[in-house]
């Protein structure tokens, strides 16, 4: 008779998509609004303080939201919220893939460049360590704050897959 290992019949918990907008909820991109409207597995995290964002407050709100969710989390962020995720990873140093199992980061702003609005520049110098989960970074060539080459460098540093919907390689 062979030894058998009991198999759990417990169904793994479905992940929650935590949408972390980088600006006022009223100004959310259409894709975010559509996801929130059509998907039952999405929840929006309002970081607040839009007129004067505060990095550590945003990181704390993000961490508290992740801690209260009792299932795997996929973070979806755009703009300045992408940097809040990078700072969360830097400060909290979570174990790889737990509880955040993935991230989609869209149009991270280049906050390390000189002459930037001081409210946004407070999120620099951007952490450059690999993120604690698989991630995708999508630049926005139409966003004046998202420098394409900087976004490519962040993807490399964060160990995120760089996905440009318009090209397969970054511009020279």
Regions found by a protein language model. Give the residues of each.
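The conserved beta1-alpha1 loop
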Residues: 18-22, 78, 139
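Gly/Ala-rich beta-loop-alpha elbow adjacent to hydrolase catalytic centers
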Residues: 75-86
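Conserved hydrolase catalytic core segment
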Residues: 87-102, 111
């Amino acid at each position: 008779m062979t030894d058998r290992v009991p198999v759990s019949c417990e169904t793994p918990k479905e992940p929650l998509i935590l949408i972390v907008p980088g600006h006022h909820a009223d100004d959310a991109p259409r894709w975010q609004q559509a996801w929130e409207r059509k998907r039952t597995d999405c929840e929006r995290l309002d970081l607040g303080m839009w007129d004067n964002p505060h990095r550590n407050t945003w990181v704390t709100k993000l961490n508290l939201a992740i801690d209260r969710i009792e299932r795997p989390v996929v973070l979806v962020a755009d703009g300045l919220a992408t940097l809040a995720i990078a700072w969360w990873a830097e400060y909290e140093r979570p174990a790889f893939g737990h509880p955040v199992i993935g991230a989609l980061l869209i149009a991270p702003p280049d906050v390390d460049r000189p002459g930037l609005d001081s409210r946004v520049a407070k999120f620099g110098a951007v952490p450059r360590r690999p993120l604690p989960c698989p991630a995708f970074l999508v630049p926005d060539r139409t966003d004046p704050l998202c420098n394409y080459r900087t976004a490519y460098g962040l993807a490399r540093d964060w160990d995120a897959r760089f996905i440009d919907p318009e090209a397969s390689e970054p511009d020279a």
